[in-house]
A protein has these predicted regions:
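A contiguous, basic/glycine-rich beta-loop/short-helix subdomain that forms a polymer-engagement track
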Residues: 1-83, 87-89, 132, 143-144, ...
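Conserved nucleotide-binding/hydrolysis micro-motifs of P-loop NTPases
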Residues: 3, 24, 37, 45-47, ...
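Short glycine-/polar-rich loops that comprise or flank the Walker A/P-loop
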Residues: 12, 36, 56-58, 100, ...
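Generic beta-strand/beta-sheet core signal
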Residues: 41, 63, 106-108, 123, ...
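Helicase motor core with emphasis on the C-terminal RecA-like subdomain
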Residues: 50-75, 84-102, 111-126, 253-261
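Conserved motor-coupling elements within RecA-like helicase/translocase cores
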Residues: 93-100, 110-182
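C-terminal helicase module of SF1/SF2 nucleic-acid helicases/translocases
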Residues: 175-303
Length: 303
C-alpha cells in the first residue's frame, strides 16, 4: 500500500511491481485478542489500568523497582501565555547548562523543536535537535544526551526506546553528570494522558541514577484550548495579566490537572465506542476465517 514497496524495490535495483492492495484491516484490539496468551511490560501501565481491563481484560501488576527511584519530579509550572512559557523554558535551561547538567527537552512537534533551538542559539547554547527524520542517527545522538553539558531537543516520537546513560553511552563522564544533578527532563507540553508525561519523565533516573523532571506549560497550549480551560476556571480566579511568573492559584492548578483526566477519559470512551462499532465486522471476519481454515485443513470442501 502507498509507495513504500515500490520505493524499496527501486532502492534495491529490482523490477518495480505494482502497488499493493489492502485486502483487509484488523483493529488492534481484535488483533491482540487473537493470541491465546497476552501480556506486556511497561513502566507506565498503572496509569492506564482501567483501559487495559476494559479493552483487553488484562490486569496490571506493579513489580517493585530493582533500585529506588531517586528522580525528583516537580509539579507542572503553569503560565498564562505561550510567550511567557517560552521564556521560562529558556531560563530553565540556561542555569542547568551553565553547571554542566545534561538536559533533554521534549516538544510536541518538529516545528517547536526548531523554534526552541533558535532561541537557545541566540543565548549561545548549542543543542542537538531530534525530529524523527533519521532514526539510526538520532538513536546514536540521544545515547549521548546524558553527557555533561549536553542539551538535546526531541520531538514527541523521536528517540524512544533508547536508554540514556549518565556520562554518555560509555558512561566515561558519569561522575561529572551526577555532580551536576543528573539528567534534567524538561517537558514543554501536557500530554492527553498521564502515561505520556510519565514516559518522558522516565527517561531520567533510570537504574537508581539521580535526575529531575519539570514540565513548563501555559493556558494557551493546544490541550488547554481544546478542552476550554477558560470555561472551567471561575472568572474570579482566571489570571487577567501575564506576570512572567508561574501561576500559584490552587483553583487554576486543580483545573489544569483536571484537563488531562478529561482528555484521558475521552480517549478511553472513543476507543470503547470504536470497539463496539467494529464488533459486528469481527463476527463476519471470524466466520470467513473459520471457513478458510476449514478449507485449508481439509475439514470442509466446496460443493
Amino acid at each position: 500500500p502507498g509507495s513504500l514497496q515500490p520505493a524499496v524495490e527501486l532502492k534495491e535495483g529490482i523490477t518495480c511491481t505494482s502497488r499493493g492492495v489492502i485486502m483487509g484491516v484488523v483493529p488492534m484490539q481484535f488483533y491482540l485478542r487473537r493470541y491465546p496468551l497476552l501480556s506486556g511490560m511497561t513502566g507506565t501501565a498503572k496509569s492506564s489500568e482501567d483501559e487495559f481491563w476494559q479493552l483487553y481484560d488484562l490486569k496490571v501488576t506493579v513489580i517493585p523497582t530493582h533500585t529506588p527511584c531517586k528522580r525528583v519530579d516537580h509539579p507542572y509550572e503553569v503560565y498564562l501565555t505561550k510567550a511567557a512559557k517560552d521564556n521560562a523554558i529558556v531560563e530553565c535551561i540556561k542555569p542547568a547548562h551553565a553547571k554542566n547538567q545534561p538536559v533533554l527537552v521534549g516538544t510536541s512537534s518538529i516545528e517547536l523543536s526548531e523554534e526552541l533551538n533558535e532561541r537557545l542559539a541566540a543565548e549561545g547554547i548549542t543543542a542537538n535537535v531530534l525530529n524523527a527524520k533519521n532514526d539510526e542517527l538520532e538513536a546514536e545522538i540521544i545515547k549521548e544526551a546524558g553527557r555533561p553539558g549536553a542539551v538535546t531537543i526531541s520531538a514527541n516520537m523521536s528517540g524512544r526506546g533508547v536508554d540514556i546513560k549518565l556520562g554518555g553511552a560509555d558512561e566515561s563522564q558519569k561522575d561529572e553528570a551526577v555532580a551536576a544533578g543528573g539528567l534534567l527532563i524538561l517537558g514543554t507540553f501536557m500530554s492527553e494522558s498521564e502515561r505520556g508525561d510519565m514516559q518522558l519523565r522516565g527517561r531520567s533516573g533510570r537504574q537508581g541514577d539521580i535526575g529531575e523532571s519539570r514540565f513548563i506549560i501555559s493556558l494557551e497550549d493546544e490541550i488547554m484550548t481544546k478542552y476550554e480551560i477558560k470555561k472551567l476556571i471561575p472568572k474570579r480566579h482566571y489570571p487577567t495579566a501575564e506576570t512572567g511568573r508561574p501561576i500559584d492559584d490552587k483553583i487554576v492548578l486543580r483545573e489544569v490537572d483536571r484537563i488531562q483526566r478529561i482528555a484521558q477519559g475521552d480517549t478511553l470512551e472513543l476507543r470503547k465506542r470504536l470497539l463496539k462499532f467494529t464488533m459486528i465486522g469481527e463476527k463476519h471476519r471470524d466466520a470467513v476465517f473459520g471457513r478458510r481454515r476449514a478449507f485449508l485443513t481439509g475439514e470442509s470442501t466446496v460443493d
